[in-house]
Amino acid sequence: MSDHSTFADRHIGLDSQAVATMLAVIGVDSLDDLAVKAVPAGILDTLTDTGAAPGLDSLPPAASEAEALAELRALADANTVAVSMIGQGYYDTHTPPVLLRNIIENPAWYTAYTPYQPEISQGRLEALLNFQTLVTDLTGLEIANASMLDEGTAAAEAMTLMHRAARGPVKRVVVDADVFTQTAAVLATRAKPLGIEIVTADLRAGLPDGEFFGAIAQLPGASGRITDWSALVQQAHDRGALVAVGADLLALTLIAPPGEIGADVAFGTTQRFGVPMGFGGPHAGYLAVHAKHARQLPGRLVGVSVDSDGTPAYRLALQTREQHIRRDKATSNICTAQVLLAVLAAMYASYHGAGGLTAIARRVHAHAEAIAGALGDALVHDKYFDTVLARVPGRADEVLARAKANGINLWRVDADHVSVACDEATTDTHVAVVLDAFGVAAAAPAHADIATRTSEFLTHPAFTQYRTETSMMRYLRALADKDIALDRSMIPLGSCTMKLNAAAEMESITWPEFGRQHPFAPASDTAGLRQLVADLQSWLVLITGYDAVSLQPNAGSQGEYAGLLAIHEYHASRGEPHRDICLIPSSAHGTNAASAALAGMRVVVVDCHDNGDVDLDDLRAKVGEHAERLSALMITYPSTHGVYEHDIAEICAAVHDAGGQVYVDGANLNALVGLARPGKFGGDVSHLNLHKTFCIPHGGGGPGVGPVAVRAHLAPFLPGHPFAPELPKGYPVSSAPYGSASILPITWAYIRMMGAEGLRAASLTAITSANYIARRLDEYYPVLYTGENGMVAHECILDLRGITKLTGITVDDVAKRLADYGFHAPTMSFPVAGTLMVEPTESESLAEVDAFCEAMIGIRAEIDKVGAGEWPVDDNPLRGAPHTAQCLLASDWDHPYTREQAAYPLGTAFRPKVWPAVRRIDGAYGDRNLVCSCPPVEAFA
C-alpha cells in the first residue's frame, strides 16, 4: 500500500503512512495486531507458510487490471453470440447509447444507495416514479412498486399478495398451463413451504371445480398465444377469487391491458425495455395492483409528499409494510430490488415515448406475422404478438439445427413443436433464415388482429419531453445532480459496505458476448460464461470455507431464502420435516425473520445482552425448549452490533447438538475475508452479498447477487432449474439458472485482481478505519458496542440516545444535517433505535474519513449549543436541515443562526458543497395522501 502499483493499492484508500496514523490512534502496533485483538482467537485463521490466509492461498495470484481484462476478454470470446429467437420471457433489445453511457456506465447512478435519505436522493426517486408510471400506464392498474427481482419472483409475490388480500382459509391457487415454465417453477418453490396448493389447468376453459383464492395467467402465454382473459376474471370474481396476469409490457402497447379487463394484479419484467438479456439478468421485474391493495405490495414504493417549505418532494412510502420494520409479519422478505435496471427501463420508455414503443411493437408483430404467414397450416395459434408456435411432427431437432447452422437459436417445445420469438433486434434477414430452417417459402403475412387497446398511455411530460439525445443527456445529468452517490462522497452506511466499484471491474458487463446471451441458450454458446461461473464458485468456496456455492439467488434476501429451503429439505430427507423452529437473535435484520417465515418456519427470538452479544443462556434454554422441532439458528457474524462475538463457536455447537443447522448471515463478510471462514467456525450455510463485500455496485437499490454457500451435506438441496440439468435438484428461487449472471464478471474481476493478500488487506483496512472512527468520535458520541478488547469490527454504532434525552436533537436531525456538510448519513436506528451505524469500508482515504469525523464533531458542537440554550430545540441548524439554496436566498430569514452557518458550517473550503434539492420531507403527509405515479413533481406545486 505504498506506490499504488497494484490494483489492491488503488482499491484500498489508505497507504502505509495513513494506516500507521490510524493504528496509532487506535493504540495497536500493526494490522496483524489489530486482527488478534479484534477477532476471537478460536476462529482467526493462522497464515500458511506462504504468508496467505488458509483457503485464499489457493486463489490465483493477483492480476493487474490489464491482465484481468484480457482474461475476461478470453472468456467472452469463448461465448458465441447467436441471434436469439428463443423468447420465453427473454428478448434481445437495443440499449440506446445515451442511456448506456449516462446510466449504466455512470457512477453517479450505479454507486448510489437505496434512497432512505430522500432529500439527497430526489433524482433517482423521480426516475423510479417514472418507472412506476410506466408500469401503471401500460398495465391499466393504479399502483406499481419500484421494481421486483425478476418475473418469476414477481409472480410468486403476486400469488402471496392475492392470498393475503383474500383473507380467507382457502390455500389453493390455479395456474394456467401456458405460464412460462420457469415462472411456474418459482411459484412452486414459493407455494410449498407456505402450504399453498397449486392446481395447473388450461384456463381458457374457465376455473376448475373447487375453491381458489386466486388464478394466474400469462399474456401472451409461453406458447405465444394471446387469450382474452376477461371471462376468466369475471368468473373468478364471482367465485371470490382474485386474478393475476403476467403481462408483456411491449405487447400492452397494442392489446388491452390487465387492468382494463378487470384483473387485480399484473406482474412481469421490463427486460425488453433496453435491458440486455445478460444470460438471465439482472432485469427489473414489476408488480402492479389496484389502489385498494397498495398496502399489500412488497418491496419499495415511491410516493409524493411535501417538504418543510411545502415544496413537493419524493420519498419511499408505506415503509411499515417492509421487512426491516415488520420482520416475520412483513409482506415479503425482499429489500430494494433492481433500481438501476428500473431506471434504465423507465428512461428507455421516456426516450421512445408512447409512439416509439408502439412502433417497435408493431414491427415486432409484423415480423411474427411474416413467419406465421409462411408457416400456413403448421401454425398452432392464430392470435399472437411476437411468438409463433409451429407444428413440425418429428422435425423439431432438424429445424433447430438448420437455424443454428445459420446463427439463430429457436425454442424446442417438444419433438413436434418449435416456437420462434421476434423482438426489437429481429430483421428481415433473420425472418428469411427462420423460414429456410422450416423449409417453407415466404408468403403473404398472416394478419393476427390483436390491436384491442384503446386507452392512451405515457402522456405525462416525463415521457414526451426527452426524445432527443441532448435533452435526455441533460435530464439524466439534472437528476444525478440531485443525489449523493460514491462519486461525490463517502457513504458511511453501516451494514451496507459502500466500497469502491472499480471501473476495471465494471468494464466487461456491457460487452455483447455477456449481455446478448439468452439464459436458455445452448450450453455450447455460453462456454465462457459457464467457466466464469465455475471460477467464481470455486473462489467463493475457498474464501468462505464451505463446500458448494449457488449463484442463482439474485439478492441477499433470496440467498437467505434459498439457504433456509436447503435446511428444510435436508431435515425432510432425514425424516424430520417437522423441524420448523428458526432461532433469531433480537438484534437481527428484519430480512432474516421475513425469510424464515417465507420458508415456512416459525421464528423464536433469542435475547441479547446489553453489550449486544447473544445471551448464551437464553439461547441454550430455547434450544432445549424446542430441541425436537429446531430447524436452524440464523446469526449474523460479525454481529449486527458491529463486533466479533467471542461465543460464536459455542453458539454453533449448542444448535448442532440439538440437531439444528447454523445459518451464518454473510452481510458482514467484509470483516471476515482472509481472517475467518464461516464454513470452518460452525456455519452450515451462508448467503453472501456480492453487492457489498465483492464490489457489485448498489445501483441506487439494486441489482445485487446473493449467492448461497453450504457445507457438503446441504449441497444436494441448492437451487435447481427446469432448464439447467447440470444444477442440483433443489427448488429454483429465480427465473434464470444463474440469476443475475451478467454482473458476475464484476466480482470475478475484483477477486482476480485483489488476490489473497489484497483481499485480506481489504478486510484489515476496513476494520482499521472503523476502529479509527470509533476512537475519534467516542468522546462526542459514545460507541455503543465493542468486543472484549475494546475493538469493533468493520463498523461502529454511535449512541445518540443520551443526547436526544438531554437536548431533543434526534438521529434524524443529525442525518439531515450531514447533507449540509456534504455527507450521506450513516444507517439510522439500526439495529438500535436512536443510534447511527457507521461503516467506512476499506476504499476511503484518511482525508475523507477525517472529513467525516470533522463533520460529526462540528454537528456535536451545534448540538451543544442547543443543549446550552443558545438555539431553541425547534429552530436550529439541525432541526432546519437540510438547507436548500432556495431557502437560503429567501428574502426573509428569521432564524437564530445565520445563512452561512446553515450552508457552510465548517467554512467554504471544507469540501465541495452539496445542495439538497428539497428540505426535510414530511413522511406522514405522503402516506396519508398516497400519490405514486407521475405527473412530475412540478405539477404538484
UniProtKB/Swiss-Prot annotation:
Disulfide bond sites: none
UniProt entry keywords in alphabetical sequence: Oxidoreductase, Pyridoxal phosphate
Coiled coil feature spans: none
Pfam families to which the protein is assigned, alphabetical: GcvP2_C, GDC-P
Entry's Gene Ontology molecular function annotations: glycine binding; glycine dehydrogenase (decarboxylating) activity; pyridoxal phosphate binding
Reactions performed catalytically: N(6)-[(R)-lipoyl]-L-lysyl-[glycine-cleavage complex H protein] + glycine + H(+) = N(6)-[(R)-S(8)-aminomethyldihydrolipoyl]-L-lysyl-[glycine-cleavage complex H protein] + CO2
Signal sequence residues: none
One GO term of the biological process aspect: glycine decarboxylation via glycine cleavage system
EC number(s) stated in the UniProt entry for this protein: 1.4.4.2
Tree of life domain: Bacteria
N6-(pyridoxal phosphate)lysine: modified positions: 692
Cofactor: pyridoxal 5'-phosphate
Subunit comment: The glycine cleavage system is composed of four proteins: P, T, L and H.
Family to which the UniProt record says this protein belongs: Belongs to the GcvP family.
Protein name, UniProt field: Glycine dehydrogenase (decarboxylating)
